[in-house]
Amino acid sequence: MSEASLAPPPGAGAATFLLTVRGKVKAATTQEARTVHNSTAGSPAGVEAARSLGDLSHQVFTGYGDGQAGEVLFIDFWNSLPGLGQFFSDPQVLAGADLLFSSRDAPVWSATSGFGDFHLTIPAGKAVTSVGLIRVKVSSLDKAADAFTAYTAATINASRRHGIVSHSVWSRVPNPGDQPDPEVIGVDLWMDTGKMTGYYDLGLGFDALGPVFAGTPDTSVWQSAPGDWTEW
């Protein structure tokens, strides 16, 4: 590893930004989609290009159940917005995404404070295997912060018994030229997919969230992508 590869990219800072790329894949099978991914974004050159511009981590999930059949989710954390913009303005990167997805959405999110986030340890021998998402427009970020904090207070103990690892809430970063529109995404990481879905079926705590929603929430559940997808 060269010294140049250890230098922070232009515009990098301590703050991290969440990139969620969700889309329908063109391939008929997950295995075929994995091959396309690993030869484009997941190729050694693709990985190095992303990391050199501030892509700190990249994980791949597939839809769990009929609701997200045929969909793939990337969860990436970046620490350089200029680097992220430069990466996704590269025609080769866009061409690779077009090979993989028939349709996709790739919003960027910034960290929030005061939303009841928590991050717990993972017991030995366990790992994150599942993700639960809730994405929704809210009446205001201040009101949403109070509501999500109340949600966490009411649910953290029960959710941990079902295997939750972390719960974080992020606010939408507007696209260049767009007006800010309060929207958040909640990201739950879990150790067991079955226990995760069982917990969500209980419907705990949502009475605290409903009053601040300014639209219908989009909820989805995901599992770690099977097979050897390139991740870092």
Language-model segment annotations:
Residues 1-232:
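Short S/T/G/P-rich N-terminal loop/turn motif that feeds into the first structured element of a domain
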